[in-house]
Amino acid sequence: MGKAVPELTGANVPFAVRARVCLLRDLGSALAPDNAFAIIQGLETVALRMKQHCENAEKVVNFLKKHKEVTKVIYSTEHNKPIADRAKKYLKGGYGPMVGIELKGGIEAGKTFIESLKMFYHVANIGDVRSLAIHPASTTHSQLNEKELAASGVTQSYVRLCIGIEHVDDIIEDLNQALNKSSKGKLRAVS
C-alpha cells in the first residue's frame, strides 16, 4: 500500500528521469527567491555598467598599446582585419571588458606584474564590476607543459584583464606602476 506503480499511473519513468537529470545538469535548479530578486536588481543597471566597462577598456587598450613593457595587446579591435571588422559590425555597444596582454620578460614578468597590482583583484573569474587580472601560466594553466600551453593559446607572459567600472585614471595608474615593476622581475641578492 502507498506505492504508485508507474505502469498504472501512465508515467513514462525513463522520460521523466532523463528530463529531470538533463535539465538539472544543463540549467541548474530553480533559483531561490532572494537570488532571483538580486538578478533582477542587477539587470536594471546592466546597460550602464557595460557602457562603462567598454569605455574604460578602450582607454586601457590605448594606454597598453604604447607601454614599453607590453609586446602585444589582445582585444577585439586589435586583431587582424576580418576579426576587427566583425567586431565593429556586430558589437555595436562596445567591445567588452576583456583585454589580454603579452609582457616582456616571460613568466617572471607575469608573476611580478600580478603581485604588483594594488587595485585589481587577482581571480580567475570574469564579469565583475571590479577590475580583475590573472596570469594563467602561473595559476590556472600551471600544470601544463610548454606544448600544452601553446595549444591552449596561453604563453608564459600572457595576462588576462577584465576591466572594471572604477575611474579609468585609477585603473591606468595601477596598470602602469605594475607594468614598470614587472620589468624588474624578482629581486635577487647580490653578493
What are these regions (language model features)?
Residues M1-M98, E102-R130, A137:
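Active-site C-terminal subdomain of aminotransferase-like
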Residues E115-S116, S131-S191:
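PLP-dependent enzyme catalytic core of the Aspartate aminotransferase-like
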